[in-house]
Amino acid sequence: MYNVGKIVNTHGLIGEIRVIATTDFPEERFQVGNTVYLFEKNSKKPEKLIIRSHRKHKNFDLLMFEGFTGIHQVERMKEGVLKIKEAQLTDLEENEFYFHEIIGCIVVTTDGEELGEITEILTPGANDVWVVKGSDKKEKLIPYIADVVKEININDKKITIEVMEGLLD
């Protein structure tokens, strides 16, 4: 199963929850009628949930689930993780990748220098930014743009970048 969001709090009194999306496509993942699986904190057993409503509010996705009508029913979901099954993943265009395919890849420069492993993907706006942690435990931020990213090999978990002036300073 693949993570699509983390429940950070409830919202209001009618059973809405606040979710920080960890999916590439929150509008698609959280569509009304879609199924997600809740893994409550410290639980390994998923609970199947059907999305009843979805809306954006500030930096959060607000969700309601079928059968849940009040805050008292959803408070237990706080700090839970929402997941989907692999079969729910959609096909991507050529040269598009899911976050889970990129995270864990090793980043090397065109000169062959290994910079580290991608541990996280930030989505600040115009383009994604990859967080690369090197053997020195320092994080480097690599923008996912054509001028920098030269080759992505998902099978070998290797990404080649061209280091622009000032990129790693």
From Swiss-Prot:
Protein's GO biological process: ribosomal small subunit biogenesis; rRNA processing
Localization, UniProt: Cytoplasm
GO cellular component, one term: cytoplasm
InterPro entries, per database record: PRC-brl_dom, PRC_barrel-like_sf, RimM, RimM_N, RimM_N_sf, Transl_B-barrel_sf
Residues annotated as domain PRC barrel: 94-167
Principal location listed in the UniProt entry: cytoplasm
Keywords: Chaperone, Cytoplasm, Ribosome biogenesis, rRNA processing
Molecular function terms, GO-annotated: ribosome binding
Pfam family of the protein (one): PRC
Record note on domains: The PRC barrel domain binds ribosomal protein uS19.
Function according to Swiss-Prot or TrEMBL: An accessory protein needed during the final step in the assembly of 30S ribosomal subunit, possibly for assembly of the head region. Essential for efficient processing of 16S rRNA. May be needed both before and after RbfA during the maturation of 16S rRNA. It has affinity for free ribosomal 30S subunits but not for 70S ribosomes.
Subunit structure: Binds ribosomal protein uS19.
Stated family: Belongs to the RimM family.
Name by which UniProt lists this protein: Ribosome maturation factor RimM
Organism per entry: Listeria monocytogenes serotype 4b (strain F2365)
